[in-house]
Swiss-Prot record:
GO MF term set: ATP binding; ATP-dependent protein folding chaperone; unfolded protein binding
Organism per entry: Burkholderia lata (strain ATCC 17760 / DSM 23089 / LMG 22485 / NCIMB 9086 / R18194 / 383)
Gene symbol of the encoding locus: dnaK
InterPro entries the UniProt entry points to: ATPase_NBD, Chaperone_DnaK, Heat_shock_70_CS, HSP70_C_sf, HSP70_peptide-bd_sf, Hsp_70_fam
Pfam families: HSP70
Positions of region (Disordered): 614-635
Lineage start: Bacteria, Pseudomonadati, Pseudomonadota, Betaproteobacteria, Burkholderiales
Modification Phosphothreonine occurs at: 200
Keyword set, alphabetical order: ATP-binding, Chaperone, Nucleotide-binding, Phosphoprotein, Stress response
Protein family per UniProt: Belongs to the heat shock protein 70 family.
Protein name: Chaperone protein DnaK
SUPFAM superfamilies for the chain: Actin-like ATPase domain, Heat shock protein 70kD (HSP70), C-terminal subdomain, Heat shock protein 70kD (HSP70), peptide-binding domain
Length: 650
């Protein structure tokens, strides 16, 4: 069985890790960095760039460079959070046929799981390059506060990327695993994981206990906001710059997608700089132009100004902390450690707020960018059976229930229930002789069903005629370890049953997922072909260069016929390499041909090198005598074409 890799699929950055024995390894990507920007660019020639290469070209290709797609995964187009993003993103967010939020690149509609799959594929390739073997299984992390649709969509992304997702685990729980297994402190500990990432915020209260030599991680409660993160902090800076520039120059940059992309980059850079310095300068020459000529942007921002701009965002993270503490049934003073996860937690104001709420300094010995991937890799090791000393007890973040008479939300499973879990309840009909019931499944905390997230609905038909309240319909809710819901309804009188895995009216159908997997495989095969062609071209270029060089140096030692054959073959290969439509087989054949005809040339070179080495050895041994004889120069001149004279001492 191959290794199960751990992937932190982040809004802004992603990361992959594996376990080697009991040591964790966070793997560097092909660019040499341990985190990869979650940015995907679709180019004019159908090439797809992922990570740093995509980020580098984003300013010149803003409409087809997709970032922060995790904010849209598993969401409906109508949701207010999605509507808010439509006005802010340089790329187009569109409504899919099923009502989901999709994105557009080069006029083609793309599902968020399909786009996220490109990042996952890069993570998979990163692990494969390191391990030297295929990787097919992964543990992927999601924000703890992700609902069922978002979890299902993340799982779909994994499948499209060619991965069997062994488990979806919550990011704060993964960070707790990374922290807990590393620490030597004995006894039970209660920790708070404060996870402020690029697009989401989570807080989890977790108890780490040592039960008969086994580390038990029990999530007591979780809370959060899936639309609050570093991207929102960046947006505040962008809005401020746009406002200042409009006041100063009278030009509104918010309608200029090229300018917006440059502003986004500058805002992120300024935010990072202000974590370590008190002031930074944003300098963007030629940001736009009007009738009077080009306009330049130059603006100083202080840390105090930034803190004023984002104060309410930082404040918004505190209420979920309060609720999580209350739901866990603990007091703030019971928390032993506070762990910070996510790049945005490096901001001094965030640190200050967390310290103020929890009454203690957060731990600094956890890498906020890598802890989540590390935890996922540990869970992968547990699932593969290689690790037996860890038990993870996670919870469902939101209550689950069905709509009953009067539009009321009747809860079947309450939030913060340990998963996996199962719950059954008997309901009846609302009308006389009702032949079918529709089961509508919701997720959320509101009293009325309409205020919650509709996950899906299904019918149970063929109920025998009976007065209202007589039929007995047993509804079963079953949440698996991924936090994904399976629902069943059974008429106890007839034994008729209907089961579904909640896929909602939204989400991707099996047919769509299969098609996306096929497309991805076709792209991968095409990429492989292009890569092989590039390798052959490079090999051809290198051979042309080395043959030309060898001909210049040793051509006069060849027969005229040999030399002509090499030159003809060389010319033929050069012509072929200039032809952009030349295929791999043709190039390989010409490379082989040139290799054969230039064999004699290679032999001459080899013989000459041997002679030089032997000459050098002889000359070194005889240097002293050569000096006495005054024949050093003569000796050197004689070292030609495998002949040398030994100069003896007088």
């Amino acid at each position: 069985m191959g290794k199960i890799i751990g992937i932190d699929l982040g809004t802004t950055n992603s990361c992959v890790a594996i376990m080697e024995g009991n040591q964790v390894k966070v793997i560097e990507n092909s660019e040499g960095t341990r985190t990869t920007p979650s940015i995907i660019a679709y180019m004019d020639d159908n090439e797809v760039l992922v990570g740093a290469p995509a980020k580098r070209q984003s300013v010149t290709n803003p409409k087809n460079t997709l970032f922060a797609v995790k904010r849209l995964i598993g969401r409906r187009f109508e949701e207010k959070e999605v509507q808010k993003d439509i006005g802010l993103m340089p790329y187009t967010i569109v409504k899919a046929d099923n009502g989901d939020a999709w994105v557009e690149a080069h006029g083609e509609k793309l599902a968020p799981p399909q786009v996220s799959a490109e990042v996952l594929r890069k993570m998979k390739k990163t692990a494969e390059d390191y391990l030297g073997e295929p990787v097919t299984e992964a543990v992927i992390t999601v924000p703890a506060y992700f609902n069922d649709s978002q979890r299902q969509a993340t799982k779909d992304a994994g499948r499209i990327a060619g991965l069997e997702v062994k488990r979806i685990i919550n990011e704060p729980t993964a960070a707790a695993l990374a922290f807990g297994l590393d620490k030597v402190e004995k006894g039970d500990r209660k920790i708070a994981v404060y996870d402020l990432g690029g697009g989401t915020f989570d807080v989890s209260i977790i108890e780490i206990a040592d039960v008969d030599g086994e580390m038990q991680f029990e999530v007591l409660s979780t809370n959060g906001d899936t639309f609050l993160g570093g991207e929102d902090f960046d947006q505040r800076i962008i809005d401020y710059i746009i406002g200042e520039f409009k006041k100063e120059q009278g030009v509104d940059l918010s309608k200029d997608v090229l300018a917006l992309q440059r502003l986004k980059e500058a805002a992120e850079k300024a935010k990072i700089e202000l974590s370590s310095s008190q002031q930074t300068e944003i300098n963007l020459p030629y940001i736009t132009a009007d009738a009077s000529g080009p306009k330049h942007l130059n603006l100083k921002i202080t840390r105090a100004k930034l803190e004023a701009l984002v104060e309410d965002l930082v404040e918004r993270t505190i209420e979920p902390c309060r609720i999580a503490i209350k739901d866990a049934g603990v007091k703030v003073s019971d928390i032993d450690d506070v762990i910070l996860v996510g790049g945005q937690t490096r901001m001094p104001k965030v640190l200050e707020k967390v310290k103020e709420f929890f009454g203690k300094d957060p731990r600094r010995d956890v890498n906020p960018d890598e802890a989540v991937a590390v935890g996922a890799a540990i869970q992968g090791q547990v699932l593969s059976g290689d690790r037996k000393d860890v038990l993870l007890l996670d919870v469902t973040p939101l209550s689950l229930g069905i709509e009953t008479l009067g539009g009321v939300m009747t809860k079947m499973i309450s939030k913060n229930t340990t998963i996996p879990t199962k719950h059954a309840q008997v309901y009846s009909t609302a009308d006389d002789n009702q032949g079918a019931v529709t089961i509508k499944v919701f997720q959320g905390e509101r009293e009325m069903a309409a205020g919650n997230k509709l996950l899906g609905e299904f019918n149970l038909e063929g109920i025998p005629p009976a007065p209202r309240g007589v039929p007995q319909i047993e509804v079963t809710f079953d949440i698996d370890a991924n936090g994904i819901l399976h629902v069943g309804a059974k008429d106890k009188a007839t034994g008729k049953e209907n089961k579904i895995t909640i896929k909602a009216n939204s989400g991707l159908s099996e047919a769509e997922i299969d098609q996306m997997i096929k497309d991805a495989e076709a792209n991968a095969a095409e990429d492989h072909k292009l890569r092989e062609l590039a390798d052959s071209r490079n090999q051809g270029d290198a051979l042309v260069h080395s043959t030309k060089k060898a001909l210049t140096e040793y051509g006069d030692k060849l027969d005229a016929g040999e030399k002509e054959a090499i030159e003809a073959s060389l010319k033929s290969l050069e012509e072929l390499l200039k032809d952009s439509s030349a295929d791999k087989a043709a190039i390989d054949a010409k490379v082989e041909e040139l290799g054969k005809v230039s064999q004699k040339l290679g032999e001459k070179m080899y013989a000459d090198m041997q002679a030089q080495q032997a000459g050098a050895a002889g000359a070194a041994g005889a240097a002293e005598g050569a000096a006495h004889a005054g024949g050093a120069q003569q000796a050197a001149d004689d070292v030609v074409d495998a002949e040398f004279k030994e100069v003896k001492k007088d």
